């Protein structure tokens, strides 16, 4: 059976506290070969690192401060995250020239800008995002980017570092064709597409094949949020990424196996891992 990768799932969320092990088992049974775990602050960074140790070779952690978590203490949060980042950097013989600097962390994320609910910490969000973009440049870990109601500001900031960045994912893409084309102008980045693509009202099934090449998409759930049809309204989980894959394969007019294969290759290109291990 072919496998798929869920490139964005919050398995550390409290919604999984009652059945986390069972949810992992369901993901594996459904054909999910790997799960990538974004962090949103210091606490969740520790949590996803712990899950990666519990599920080695299956769960892969990230590190970052989510824009909605940028509050009055954001500088202290970033300082603590920077300390964790340094603790996980390989040194000496373990770090060979041209090889990844980290044995476990696969991305800086979930980071970005979010002006949807409030612009109270707008300036602080920009500062925190830019600092973490610099971490990506320095470490060459890709970015997992969250952006709502701030694409212009995000694009402006990323242009400053475009040539130095290793790439990344524009997570939870739900925009139109013009917005997709603007994001794809960052040629080392891909679009993360999830459950919204399965909604009856979604335009993504038409817009994505029109302007987004197959080699510029990765699959995600963003669980426990935004469950795909036929689970809409319920708690989302990684096993449901298969529904996203089926929907998009049909939209692109190719087999589910070919769509899974290509999106796995895309994940391998962006993140420091080998698809041969999936």
What is the role of each PLM region?
Residues 1-278:
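Mid-domain alpha/beta scaffold segments of enzyme catalytic cores
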């Amino acid at each position: 059976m072919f496998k798929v990768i869920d490139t964005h799932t919050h398995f550390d969320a409290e919604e999984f506290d009652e059945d986390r092990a069972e949810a992992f088992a369901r993901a594996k049974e459904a054909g999910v070969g790997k799960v990538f775990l974004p962090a949103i602050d210091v606490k969740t960074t520790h949590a996803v690192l712990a899950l990666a140790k519990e599920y080695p070779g299956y769960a892969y952690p990230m590190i970052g401060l989510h824009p909605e978590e940028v509050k009055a203490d954001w500088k202290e949060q970033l300082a603590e995250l920077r300390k964790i980042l340094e603790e996980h950097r390989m040194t000496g013989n373990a770090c060979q020239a041209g090889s990844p600097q980290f044995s476990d962390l696969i991305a800086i994320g979930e980071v970005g800008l979010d002006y949807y609910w409030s612009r109270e910490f707008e300036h602080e969000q920009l500062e925190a995002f830019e600092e973490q973009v610099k971490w990506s440049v320095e470490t060459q870990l890709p970015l997992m980017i969250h952006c709502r109601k701030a694409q212009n500001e995000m694009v402006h900031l990323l242009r400053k570092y475009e040539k130095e960045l290793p790439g990344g994912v524009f997570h939870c893409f739900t925009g139109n064709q013009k917005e997709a084309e603007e994001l794809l102008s960052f040629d080392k980045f891909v679009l993360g597409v999830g459950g919204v693509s399965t909604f009856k009202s979604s335009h993504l099934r038409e817009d994505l094949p029109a302007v987004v090449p197959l080699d510029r998409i990765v699959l995600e759930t963003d669980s426990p949020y935004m469950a795909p049809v036929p689970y809409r309204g319920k708690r989302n989980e990684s096993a449901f990424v298969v529904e996203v894959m089926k929907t998009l394969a049909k939209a692109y007019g190719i087999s589910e196996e070919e769509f899974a294969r290509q999106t796995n290759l895309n994940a391998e290109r962006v993140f420091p891992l080998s698809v041969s291990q999936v």
